[in-house]
């Protein structure tokens, strides 16, 4: 989580960029409304990343041994127990955990941050910025909290944060490592130094940071970090919270149930210490093993490999989009020193949902549209109506980026070939002849519906 400048082994944004690692679905063929198929260009890594081939291989390898853990005498149970605890150690090593830190497996980042919210001391506020994903905003609203408005520069934002910490005691500062909307990295090390100066701890929402940058709790001094397997090339249902033991040992158990206790009577319970205290029920052993395999694979890459690969693709994408009339790429800060490869843009006079539907239906490109579970940030950017987000990862190649830029340029210059209508808040091709696999069910046109999208019927050609 340290800022650094790439001074060697860089790629030119005009060079052909190949995938850094093998991912499942890299050669997936997607049908087009205009007929035929194209290789799916997955530019939606920030939402959920595909499984690394190495992760899928690991899951297939351990699956025959799957069994209930911790108290089974059978051989498979002993293997599964050893696998779970080895996975715990691997994930801790991935984030540079301190010797006394606890690794708690959860469902995802949202789950992990809600868990921590139930373990906070009651003597101070939680402080966060208005640029956070809802997962790092809503859990803190249940208790004493303060929101600091981010300024137009990181320097001014740090000043505002220090003013808030000086003004009133805070128990925790909750900060994102990298914006899920713009990709801009926040200076975690400096935030930690500020928070500790005023007696507050820091939790880092690393959902976006973990797949793209090295994390080191010892070096940064951050107290807690949370991230998800499904964004870190291990979409098997596991997430994690890693951090200091004392709050987790004293906090309210996240779920009440078997495995989280030392002793139970009909009217009282003695809870176990963390991590068991917060892992009631049968754990997701395969999810933990998958997350550990992803961590091992990413950690084995050369130090700057991720940054070099992403920097070339991001620059290629931003340069291409900003070269199209009527297209604007959005950012929060004027002085962000670095960004992960997440780019949010709008097309003048074209609804973001229509842009995304067009890219999918006519060009086989997957992007995200909407408000990205960050309503306050989209509002401050003037994008309450939504935007389009393109994001890359280890399986992305330069051809994916080039296809997106070409498709957006064609949309601006000539418009879509097909007719589209807004159905229950989502733009969809009308008609939509693309078949779904038989095992997927018949939900064509409704797969993108969301409770936070409320728009009336519209048609566009």
PLM feature spans:
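Pyridoxal 5′-phosphate
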Residues: 1-461
């Amino acid at each position: 989580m340290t800022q650094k400048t790439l001074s060697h082994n860089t790629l030119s944004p005009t060079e052909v960029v190949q995938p850094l690692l093998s991912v499942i679905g890299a050669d997936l063929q997607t049908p087009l409304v205009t007929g035929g198929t194209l290789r799916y260009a997955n530019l939606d890594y920030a939402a959920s990343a595909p499984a690394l081939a190495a992760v899928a291989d690991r899951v297939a390898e351990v699956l025959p041994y799957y069994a209930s853990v911790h108290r089974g005498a059978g051989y498979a149970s002993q293997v599964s127990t050893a696998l779970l605890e080895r996975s715990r150690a691997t994930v801790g090593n991935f984030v540079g955990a301190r010797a006394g830190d606890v690794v708690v497996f959860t469902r995802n980042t949202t789950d992990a941050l809600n868990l921590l919210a139930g373990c906070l001391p009651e003597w101070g506020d939680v402080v966060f910025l208005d640029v956070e994903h809802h997962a790092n905003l809503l859990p803190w609203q249940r208790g004493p909290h303060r929101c600091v408005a981010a300024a137009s520069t990181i320097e001014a934002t740090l000043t505002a944060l220090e003013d808030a910490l000086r003004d009133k005691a805070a128990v925790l500062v909750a900060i994102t490592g990298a914006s899920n909307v713009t990709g801009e990295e926040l200076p975690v090390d400096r935030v930690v130094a500020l928070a500790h100066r005023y007696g507050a701890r820091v939790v880092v929402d690393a959902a976006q940071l973990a797949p793209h940058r090295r994390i080191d709790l010892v070096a940064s001094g951050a107290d807690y970090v949370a991230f998800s397997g499904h964004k870190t090339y291990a979409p098997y249902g596991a997430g994690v919270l890693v951090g200091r033991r004392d709050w987790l040992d004293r906090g309210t158990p996240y779920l009440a149930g078997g495995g989280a206790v030392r002793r139970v009577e009909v009217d009282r319970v003695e809870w176990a210490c963390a991590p068991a205290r917060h892992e009631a029920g049968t754990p997701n052993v395969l999810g933990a093993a998958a997350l550990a395999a992803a961590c091992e694979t990413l950690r084995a890459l050369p130090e700057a490999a991720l940054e070099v690969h992403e920097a070339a693709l991001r620059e290629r994408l931003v340069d291409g989009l900003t070269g199209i009339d009527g297209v604007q790429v959005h950012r929060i800060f004027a002085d962000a020193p670095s960004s992960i490869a997440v780019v949010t843009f709008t097309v003048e006079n074209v609804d973001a949902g229509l842009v995304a539907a067009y890219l999918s239906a006519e060009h086989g490109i997957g992007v995200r549209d909407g408000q990205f579970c960050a309503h306050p940030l989209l509002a401050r950017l003037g994008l309450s109506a939504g935007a389009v987000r393109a994001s890359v990862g280890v399986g992305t190649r330069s051809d994916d980026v080039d296809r997106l830029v070409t498709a957006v340029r064609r949309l601006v210059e000539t418009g879509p070939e097909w007719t589209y209508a807004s159905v229950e808040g989502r733009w969809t091709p009308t008609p939509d002849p693309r078949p779904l696999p038989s095992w997927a069910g018949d939900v064509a046109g409704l797969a993108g519906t969301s409770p936070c999208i409320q728009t009336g019927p519209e048609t566009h050609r």
